[in-house]
């Protein structure tokens, strides 16, 4: 009887889940926009504050965007994971392309559906043709 009561009150392993959805880039002056370092900073820091967390699960759905913002967000994820000693598991939903895949690479493991669009990190460059 006592052991079953004790099991009931024991804490289960905690996995913190956060979502990173949208185009990666700076927020416009009208307040709309996607993911950037400034608007993901508090979310990520709060996720890593849970001392009992066994892992952080990041659900990603992004076609990519700004290389600079992708790098800053991914670096923050890696830094927090190392500092807090909490592994990050990334789950790619519909799309994790370009910068979205860059974010997923910040995790220890990447999971996706067989139908998810993954990868395709590239750069579009325009020139005057000479």
Predicted regions and their residues:
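Terminal-region recognition feature
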Residues: 1-130
């Amino acid at each position: 009887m006592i052991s079953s009561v004790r099991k009931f009150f024991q804490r289960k392993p905690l996995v913190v889940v956060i979502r990173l959805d949208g185009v990666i880039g700076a927020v416009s002056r009208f307040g709309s926009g996607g993911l950037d370092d400034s608007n993901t900073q508090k979310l990520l820091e709060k996720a890593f504050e849970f001392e009992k967390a066994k892992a952080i699960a990041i659900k990603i759905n992004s076609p990519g965007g700004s290389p600079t913002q992708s790098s800053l967000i991914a670096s923050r994820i890696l830094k927090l994971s190392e500092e807090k000693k909490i592994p990050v598991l990334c789950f790619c939903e519909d799309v994790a392309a370009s910068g979205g895949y860059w974010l997923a690479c910040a995790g220890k493991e990447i999971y996706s559906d067989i139908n998810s669009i993954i990868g395709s990190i590239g750069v579009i460059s325009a020139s005057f043709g000479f």
